[in-house]
Amino acid sequence: MHIVILDGGSTNPGDVSWAPLRALGSVTVYDSTKPEKIVERAKDAEAVILNRNVISREIMQKLPKLRFIGLLATGYNTVDVKAAGELGITVCNVPLYCVETVAQQAFALLLELCNHTEKISAATRGGDWDKAETMSHSTHPLFELYGKTLGIVGFGHIGQTVAKLGAALGMKILVYSRTKRELPERYQWAELDALFKNADVVSLHCPLTDETRGLVNAERLNLMKPTAFLINTARGAVVDEAALAEALNSGRIAGAGLDVLVHEPPKKDDPLLAAQNCIVTPHIAWASRDARARLIKTVAENLKAFRNGTPQNVVS
């Protein structure tokens, strides 16, 4: 089987192995592929593996040998899955491979906002502590999470894991989700506006849909406490970026930690890149080495199951 990986660079910059896929056939790896090069590079492929490249009906119709599309991701909005099904092409995704690492990044962003570790360390290494006359010296006040309220928007696997981390630190947990289920003791359901009003930290873990696009708008930001933080490891377009930048720069909320933006990479004039008390990381929450190794392993398992006539994780 000839396997083409169109954009393997983000999944594997060289620190993990493609061996699970190489065991299934001949593999050609491209770090990235421009849209106009997809057909040329995949023309002889029976299986195409991709992360962010867009595969339309038109492209699939130009790839007569294509039988399988393996997504190096959980989301599958980059592939026309309806067309794939009609053309007899199986599309498989990888659920749950990065739950823990995304939750870890959400808390890394939150803890940096609370403890200012990098800023305080830089000040200390710059001689600030040397000049002090006290044993304990800090250039930034610390924010304690114990007893505070964590609002979780979206209660899938990642949202549940973030809630557990918050509960372990003694936080009260408010949950908003379209689907209700039994909650652990000390968790409470909340309507969306009530959650924004009462939470000390709002953490977003919902998918991007027509319903959630722009969900965090000026009106909801105005509901938040001036001491509250917003964390987004979901999708950039869930947040109105201009409204969030205004809320940060005016002191309407205390800070934001973002791993996702509307445009990735961002435009140079993205207002959040210069916003006050805003930490931005380049969509890396999913990308721990362990998570990326799991991702490649599961894509290979998906392809092997397809070849054996028992496909798994099918989304087409």
Positions of PLM-derived features:
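N-terminal glycine-/charge-rich "phosphate-binding" loop or analogous flexible N-terminal tail
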Residues: 1-45, 174, 307
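Short beta->alpha connector loops at strand-helix junctions that form conserved
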Residues: 31, 51, 72-73, 89-100, ...
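An anion/phosphate-binding loop that grips the pyrophosphate of nucleotide cofactors and donors
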Residues: 45, 63, 199
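Rossmann-like adenosine-cofactor binding region
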Residues: 54-60, 172-174, 178-271
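Phosphate-binding beta-alpha-beta segment of Rossmann-like dinucleotide-binding domains, i.e.
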Residues: 87, 95-149, 315
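Rossmann-like dinucleotide-binding domain for NAD(H)/NADP(H)
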Residues: 87, 91-92, 227-316
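Glycine-rich Rossmann-fold phosphate-binding loop(s) that bind the pyrophosphate
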Residues: 155-156
